[in-house]
A protein has these predicted regions:
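N-terminal glutamine amidotransferase
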Residues: 1-106, 139-157
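Short, conserved phosphate-binding/catalytic loop or strand-edge motifs used
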Residues: 134-138
Length: 157
């Protein structure tokens, strides 16, 4: 399964991301296929996504590398190591963002019935850009809220 690391500190803004990067390196064995990061500043309501040294080359041209740009004023930070099971392409990169950038999802597990859920969400008008269960989970959340978990079969964390 994948690996997730993160922290939240509402009282104090942090800028250094090296601790997050080190934590994610420690769990690299949990996900050899990719790594990704998302950091959030609750005061300014801004977010930044990062790739890492083990991210696919195509992603490195789309976002900054956490090693080369290790500073962002933030309160909340997540790192993710990906072990690809369903969609093996870079399109399954996590943290996974909604099309408008308002929702960010980190997901560890496998949704066995994601194809059935995807068909239902397609009928409701959602347009998918990947073949991964992560996007199905996010689309389900945007459609049904936390009730999406009631419809998912499989191990989810």
């Amino acid at each position: 399964m994948c690996g997730i690391a993160g922290y939240f500190n509402h009282a104090k803004t942090r800028t250094d991301l090296s601790g997050l990067y080190k934590a994610v390196r420690l769990i690299a064995h949990r996900g050899p296929d990719d790594e990704g990061y998302a950091v959030f500043n609750v005061d300014t309501q801004t977010a930044q996504k990062y790739c890492g040294p083990d991210s696919p080359a195509v992603l490195k041209s789309q976002m900054p590398d956490i090693v080369q740009h290790p500073h962002f004023a933030h309160h909340l930070a997540f790192g993710f190591r990906r072990f690809s099971i369903v969609d093996l392409s870079e399109k399954g990169h996590q943290p996974f963002w909604s099309p408008d950038g308002s929702v960010c999802l980190i997901f560890n597990g496998e949704i066995y019935n994601y194809i059935e859920l995807q068909k239902e969400l397609l009928q409701l008008g959602y347009c998918f850009t990947t073949a991964c269960d992560t996007e199905v989970l996010l689309a389900g959340y945007l459609t049904w809220g936390m009730d999406v978990l009631k419809f998912c079969n499989g191990p989810i964390a």
